[in-house]
């Protein structure tokens, strides 16, 4: 289920899970990193295989800045519960969000390593026109006008944001660093 709000209504999510269980199929869905253990258990017992979870950042202030409505400690407990139940996690993270620094990027990488999703995806903050991020970036001079298209001619995402303390090049290069430090860490 590709629905960012799938787990917002827990009774609905549990009812859908039970119906999927009757069908005997395995399935996956998007989830916020705050689903309680009992709901996760119902979902797993009814065929849930994988959750796609938008963690975004491991820094509480960054999460507050983007109005994520999530606490890092809650996300850690949620992830621990998923591992306990055998639910696979594809975690998604974003670098270059408002307030980002070299230190917060390292904090998010450490967070990802600690919670240990099975796979992850790292994206660049993308200030799409009409969004609050675009307005904020324009008003504060954070938007690199040369990268206003958000992708290059090959479809590769560009880091259009920069901050006084963090360049768009540093933000862009942090994506590869994130993948490298997560996937090539020692055991």
Can you describe what each PLM-predicted range is?
Residues 1-2:
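Active-site groove signature of glycoside hydrolases
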Residues 5-11, 15-186:
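A structural motif corresponding to the C-terminal lobe/cap of the Radical SAM core domain
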């Amino acid at each position: 289920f590709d629905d960012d709000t799938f787990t917002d209504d827990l009774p609905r999510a549990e009812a859908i899970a039970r119906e999927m269980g009757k069908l005997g199929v395995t399935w996956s869905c998007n989830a916020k990193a705050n689903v309680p253990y009992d709901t996760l258990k119902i979902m797993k017992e009814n065929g849930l295989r994988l959750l796609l979870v938008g963690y975004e950042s491991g820094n509480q202030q960054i999460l507050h800045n983007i109005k994520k409505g999530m606490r890092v400690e809650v996300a850690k407990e949620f992830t621990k519960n998923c591992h306990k139940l055998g639910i696979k996690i594809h975690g998604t993270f974003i670098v270059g969000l408002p307030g980002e620094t070299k230190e917060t990027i390292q904090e998010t990488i450490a967070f990802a390593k600690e919670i240990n999703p099975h796979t992850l995806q790292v994206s660049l903050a993308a200030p799409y026109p009409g969004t609050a991020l675009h307005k904020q970036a324009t008003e504060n001079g954070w938007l690199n006008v040369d990268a206003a298209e958000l992708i290059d001619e090959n479809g590769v995402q560009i880091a259009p944001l920069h901050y006084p303390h963090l360049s768009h090049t540093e933000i862009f290069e942090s994506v590869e660093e994130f993948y490298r430090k997560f996937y090539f860490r020692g055991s």
